[in-house]
């Protein structure tokens, strides 16, 4: 069996299977003689519940078991690449139908690669499932097969995006697709073509954001999405999910034009969406700049409170923790690299760097990496000579914000820093507020433990918007409950 990273197999708990089938409308007598497929069926978590529901509804209307067997063979379909999971699936389906005294069903479940199957196209009334999550760098031999799909052309793509394209292709007119996948498609570069497709087709019916709740072992934040082919939907319903109680909560009925802001899909109430549109699309004065801190790519070498020398050493703040340390800074105060001769003329520094040389080269030759003794990237070097403010990027509430002044001559790493002439108290009033936390939550960049993160650009846009409108300080952007 392929590794999980290569196969993307993440098996779905039964309660979520039921939720997804309910969202898709696969219940009641309307499911009879309707085609349904799970095109990445694994051991049959969805197909087992589908068979159970079909048998239950059929037997309410007829006791003709021969016809029921024929229906199960005709209307229920599956695809699974892994032969072990495929055999488990067939066994599990046979176990289900044995309860109804059915035997030797000719299951239309195929042990093959869904990427190459086309004969289900335009035939399915329902496409459901939990498609595999595999990042592009883990696709191994499947890379070329995945990259020829339209939805996988941008960014660090993922296999589940190809399955969206496959699923849409399988639907008949009026057919419904309901997947649970990573929620990253709403805001990632990789998901941009899918978002454009949704804007054109207006086929989105429901979005259910599981937010911080993670039903799978895999480190992914997920979302249930329902689409309908051939029927234009002017709006869709956005829901959230109470994970520990398995309850779907309705939040807002929204238009796709409202939630698409700069080719990113945001999920929020209408007032928040309006505020986000003002922040991201309006032009504001450049009052602050927000940048990423040092990226030495070898913090364990360059940063330590106990460096065995004092030359070319500066104070450095770890923005993520608010703790100060010391950094070997082989640059001028303006961030220009010192020459090899200058750096290695100090015996203690020379011995220290030579001792860590193999680690800094990271398997490369000195010829290929002649400046191995410098930081891995140049970001933040030229701002050491400036006053600035450091801030962490992973927060859960205002108390978790770490904001500190960093004077000229000191550096910042593991977080962001702000360049501005605005006074510290004003910045604190903007950042240490529930309004700012509401903004961060609305970005939906989830981190484990209920935390959120944000980018340098998102922080810069927010602060500039607030400062540009500071004279109207009585107006709050985000509603605070």
How would you label these PLM feature ranges?
Residues 277-481:
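Polybasic, glycine- and aromatic-enriched phosphate-binding surface used to engage nucleic acids
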Residues 103-114:
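Conserved SAM-binding strand-loop segment of SAM-dependent methyltransferases
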Residues 75, 106-108, 203-206:
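Conserved beta-strand segments of alpha/beta enzyme cores
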Residues 34, 74, 125, 205, ...:
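Conserved acidic residues
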Residues 5-6, 10-19, 40-48, 55, ...:
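Signature of N6-adenine DNA methyltransferases within the class I
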Residues 71, 218-222, 411-413:
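Short, solvent-exposed loop/turn segments at the edges of secondary structure
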Residues 96-103, 197, 201:
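A short alpha->loop->secondary-structure connector
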Residues 1-71, 77-95, 113-118, 131, ...:
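Class I S-adenosyl-L-methionine
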């Amino acid at each position: 069996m392929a590794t999980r990273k290569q196969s993307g197999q993440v098996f779905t708990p039964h309660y979520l299977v039921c939720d997804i089938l309910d969202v898709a409308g696969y219940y009641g007598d309307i499911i009879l003689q309707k085609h349904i497929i799970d095109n990445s069926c694994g051991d049959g978590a969805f197909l087992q519940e589908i068979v159970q529901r079909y048998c239950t509804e059929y037997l309410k209307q007829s006791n003709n078991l021969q016809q029921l067997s024929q229906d199960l063979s005709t209307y229920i379909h599956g695809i699974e690449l892994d032969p072990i999971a495929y055999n488990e699936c067939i066994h599990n389906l046979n176990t289900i139908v044995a309860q109804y005294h059915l035997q030797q069903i000719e299951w239309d479940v195929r042990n093959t690669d869904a990427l190459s199957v086309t004969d289900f196209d335009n035939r399915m009334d329902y496409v459901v499932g939990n498609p595999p999550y595999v990042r592009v760098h883990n696709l191994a031999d499947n890379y070329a097969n995945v990259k020829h799909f339209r939805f996988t052309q941008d960014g660090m793509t993922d296999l589940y995006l190809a399955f969206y394209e496959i699923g849409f292709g399988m639907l008949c007119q009026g057919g419904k697709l309901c997947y649970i996948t990573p929620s990253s498609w709403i805001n990632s570069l990789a998901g941009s073509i899918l978002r454009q497709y949704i804007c054109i087709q207006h086929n989105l019916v429901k979005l259910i954001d599981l937010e911080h709740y993670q039903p799978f072992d895999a480190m992914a934040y997920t979302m249930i999405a329902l689409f309908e082919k051939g029927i234009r939907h002017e709006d869709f319903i956005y829901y959230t999910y109470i994970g520990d109680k398995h309850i779907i909560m309705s939040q807002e009925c929204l238009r796709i034009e409202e939630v698409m802001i700069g080719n990113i899909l945001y999920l929020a109430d209408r007032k928040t969406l309006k505020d986000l549109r003002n922040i991201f699309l309006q032009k504001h004065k450049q009052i602050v700049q927000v940048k990423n801190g040092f990226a030495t790519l070898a913090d364990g070498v360059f940063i330590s409170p106990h460096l065995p020398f004092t030359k070319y050493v500066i104070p450095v703040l770890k923005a993520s923790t608010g703790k100060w340390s010391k950094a070997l800074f082989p640059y001028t105060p303006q961030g220009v690299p010192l020459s090899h001769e200058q750096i290695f003329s100090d015996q203690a520094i020379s011995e220290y760097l030579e001792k860590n040389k193999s680690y800094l080269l990271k398997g490369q030759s000195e010829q290929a990496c002649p400046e191995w003794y410098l930081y891995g990237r140049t970001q933040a070097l030229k701002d050491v000579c400036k006053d600035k403010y450091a801030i962490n990027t992973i927060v859960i509430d205002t108390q978790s914000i770490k904001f500190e002044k960093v004077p000229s001559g000191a550096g910042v790493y593991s977080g962001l820093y702000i360049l501005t002439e605005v006074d510290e108290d004003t910045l604190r009033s903007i950042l240490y507020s529930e309004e700012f936390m509401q903004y961060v939550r609305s970005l939906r960049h989830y981190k484990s433990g209920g935390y959120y993160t944000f980018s340098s650009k998102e922080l810069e846009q927010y602060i500039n918007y607030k400062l540009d409108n500071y004279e109207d300080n009585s107006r709050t952007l985000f509603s605070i409950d």
